[in-house]
């Protein structure tokens, strides 16, 4: 008439969770670790370290507004492209500076309307 009581297994929060599952949850939610370390002798503080560590997935970091790796040229996949572009710009600036120096040597610089300089070019007509 009465049912026999059978012992039931105790359920824990880690049942069926592997390391990969836990890591996925941590990266999905994000975790912040904060700490302060101070080294002092007597009342003189010698060293103070403030540690703030955020562990999160890239998607979660972007969601909370952290995306510094996108603008850092050393971490970007476009590093080579940016370096090549910078080299081209430097070469162009050098060329323009040489042309300006040559113009100053052969042309006359006068003050124009409202005091802005303009160049009078001298050409050799053949």
UniProtKB/Swiss-Prot annotation:
What would be one Pfam family of this protein?
A: Gas_vesicle
Which InterPro entries does this chain map to?
Gas-vesicle_GvpA-like, GvpA, GvpA-like_CS
Which PROSITE patterns does the UniProt entry name for this protein? Answer: GAS_VESICLE_A_1 (PS00234), GAS_VESICLE_A_2 (PS00669)
Gene Ontology terms, MF aspect: structural molecule activity
Q: Which GO terms describe its cellular component?
A: gas vesicle; vesicle membrane
Q: Give the subcellular location.
A: Gas vesicle
Instruction: Give the UniProt keywords, A-Z.
Output: Gas vesicle
> What is the stated purpose of this protein?
A minor component of the gas vesicle, might be involved in nucleating gas vesicle formation. Gas vesicles (GV) are hollow, gas filled proteinaceous nanostructures. During planktonic growth they allow positioning of the organism at a favorable depth for light or nutrient acquisition.
UniProt record similarity statement: Belongs to the gas vesicle GvpA family.
How the protein assembles, per its UniProt entry? Interacts with GvpA.
> Which named protein is this?
Gas vesicle protein J
Q: Which species is listed as the source?
A: Pseudanabaena galeata (strain PCC 6901)
Q: What is the lineage of its organism?
A: Bacteria, Bacillati, Cyanobacteriota, Cyanophyceae, Pseudanabaenales
Q: Which gene encodes it?
A: gvpJ
